[in-house]
């Protein structure tokens, strides 16, 4: 967003955004996320290779639960519907929470995933690599950075 430009956002939202943006811990966390991009891409590729058609997310969910535990989340569980969740306690005493979410399933059937390829421009190709596997890998990177930076 261009500084000083009114994009129609709620003034309270803009104020909150500016405060978050100015926090040194947030800046450090964002730098960590950028620096760890190769690791995030590796996780994205790994998760994309675990086929998870809707209603059959067990294997991908089990691996994601492991990754959340490794990242330091507490209370990592899988609910009866196959959703995986965990908690990362913040360091502030604001009483506020942040939700970071994504979904495990893809629209692809078993057998559709043959591998991950990369084109000449560096784009990854694989059924489900972006929907929503990219978000799962990115969320994990953000959670790791938050944990390391004490956010």
Segments and roles (model prediction):
Residues 36, 57, 135:
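Charged, low-complexity surface patches
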Residues 42-43, 57, 105, 131:
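Acidic active-site catalytic centers that drive phospho-/nucleotidyl reactions
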């Amino acid at each position: 967003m261009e500084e000083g430009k009114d994009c129609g956002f709620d003034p309270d939202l803009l104020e909150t955004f500016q405060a978050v943006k100015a926090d040194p811990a947030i800046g450090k966390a964002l730098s960590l996320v950028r620096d760890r991009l190769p690791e995030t891409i590796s996780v994205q590729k790994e998760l994309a290779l675990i086929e998870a058609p809707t209603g059959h997310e067990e294997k991908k969910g089990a691996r994601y639960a492991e990754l959340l535990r490794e990242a330091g989340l507490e209370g990592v569980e899988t609910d009866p519907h196959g959703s995986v969740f965990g908690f990362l306690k913040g360091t502030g005493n604001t009483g506020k929470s942040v939700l970071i979410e994504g979904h495990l399933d893809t629209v692809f059937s078993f057998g559709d995933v043959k591998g991950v390829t990369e084109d000449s421009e560096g784009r990854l190709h694989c059924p489900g690599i972006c929907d929503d596997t990219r978000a799962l890998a990115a969320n994990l990177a953000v959670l790791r950075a938050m944990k390391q930076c004490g956010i």
